[in-house]
């Protein structure tokens, strides 16, 4: 048996597995324990207000001040984001996804990250109201 050929086949197989893992959606990398984390600041008005300021300082550059997304960055008001477990969003803030332009915010203290999540979750799928120009009937 040709051990070099067998070794080469194993390397190719390993490379394929690693590539498939790297290309998997980020949510597949979240462990059950991480996913089960619950935001200690959920639905707290003070935390949501603090999260809004933090969002403006750290997130609005890419996701837009209205969180509807900009420059090919995703909206955070979508049903997918709003249905995501708090722990999944926390994982993303902690780890980021540089392949898609999302930096890690692990340098921010945990309470700060949870406040940002409380704010994002408070947005729901609602979009800011658009003014109807004068003279236009609805």
Feature names for model-found ranges:
Residues 33-34, 69-72, 98:
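N-terminal alpha-helical segment
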Residues 1-45, 134-138:
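N-terminal export/targeting leaders of redox proteins
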Residues 25-38, 56, 100-138:
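Flexible coil segments in periplasmic/lumen-exposed cytochrome c-class electron-transfer proteins
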Residues 41-52, 64-94:
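Gly/Gly-Pro-rich "capping" loops immediately C-terminal to redox-active cysteine motifs
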Residues 11, 40, 78, 102-105:
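Generic anion/oxyanion-binding catalytic loop in active/binding sites
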Residues 59-62:
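Short cysteine clusters
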Residues 15, 52-55:
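Residue-level signal for mature regions of secreted extracellular proteins and peptides
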């Amino acid at each position: 048996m040709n051990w070099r050929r067998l070794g080469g086949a194993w390397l190719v197989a390993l490379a394929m597995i690693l590539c498939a893992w790297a290309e998997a959606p980020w949510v597949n990398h979240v462990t059950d324990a991480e996913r089960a984390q619950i935001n200690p600041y959920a639905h707290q008005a003070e935390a949501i207000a603090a999260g809004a300021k933090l969002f403006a300082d750290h997130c609005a550059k890419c996701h837009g001040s209205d969180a509807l997304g900009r420059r090919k960055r995703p909206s955070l008001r979508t049903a997918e984001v709003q249905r995501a477990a708090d722990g999944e969003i926390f994982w993303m803030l902690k780890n980021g996804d540089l392949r898609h332009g999302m930096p890690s915010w692990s340098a921010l203290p945990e309470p700060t990250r949870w406040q940002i999540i409380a704010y994002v979750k408070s947005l729901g799928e609602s979009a800011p109201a658009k003014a109807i120009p004068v003279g236009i009937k609805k």
